[in-house]
Regions:
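Non-catalytic cap/lid and distal C-terminal segments of serine-dependent acyl enzymes
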Residues: 1-223
Length: 223
């Protein structure tokens, strides 16, 4: 297993960025050969790539499964393009990051070997960008995703969220539902080919997002 930190100038974000990469380059059995299957893993709200590596057994899983893991930092922006701020976070994680890491590292360029996943806000980012860039990603993994952004505001004790903040990212609540940002709308569309495979999970005690995840699950089952 190899661990890398890469700093480069992002065109989409118009600033320098740091990414963490785990490669299964030296498997004990010598069975993992490049180009590697790749998971782009998105941190949640207020989290960083370092936190995910610290709290999760990503290095071991990379070695066991023979998969590269690429982790950008989150920015509390739900991985959206925000032209008014000249910040294109969706373009960054869904397009630029894939292209840059494929040029730098021995990663597979095949769709069937390229996945996106995330936790909480990162889970929303994975759902949104996995669907948007479905020609790039064949699988989406969403762990306790904030799959309905505006439902977060229904939780009185939810820290760090405000309607003004969400309106700055998604527009009004009325504009959000039925738009491409609404995961129930996007993932149940009938006019879409090449839909990624989806793994969706959430603990029942995760009261911040459980109702939203259940809502998405019900919508998918009705499809």
């Amino acid at each position: 297993m190899a661990f890398l930190q890469i700093d480069y100038k992002s065109e989409a974000l118009m600033r320098g960025v740091n990414i963490k990469v785990i490669l299964p380059s030296d498997g004990m059995a010598g069975k993992w050969e490049p180009p590697y299957k790749t998971l782009y893993l998105l941190p949640g709200y207020s989290a960083t790539a370092t936190e995910l590596i610290t709290y999760l057994g990503l290095r071991g899983q990379s070695e066991l499964k023979g998969i590269a893991i690429v982790l950008p930092d989150g920015e509390n922006l739900f991985y959206q393009d925000l032209p008014d701020r000249m910040t294109f976070y969706s373009t960054y994680v869904g397009k630029e990051l894939v292209e840059v890491t494929r040029k730098m590292l021995p990663l597979s360029t095949k769709r069937e070997d390229t996945f996106i996943g995330g936790i909480s806000m990162g889970g929303y980012g994975a759902l949104y960008n996995g669907f948007k860039y479905r020609d790039t990603f064949s699988k989406v993994v969403a762990f306790s995703p904030a799959s309905d952004a505006y439902m977060l505001l229904a939780e009185e004790d939810a820290p760090g969220f405000s309607r003004k903040q969400f309106e700055g990212i998604f527009g009004s609540k009325e504009a959000y539902y039925g738009s491409e940002c609404d995961m129930c709308t996007q993932w149940t569309r009938k006019d879409v080919d090449n839909r990624p495979e989806l793994f969706l999970c959430c603990g029942k005690d995760d009261r911040l997002v459980y109702d939203a995840v259940e809502k998405l699950e019900n919508a998918l089952q009705k499809e």
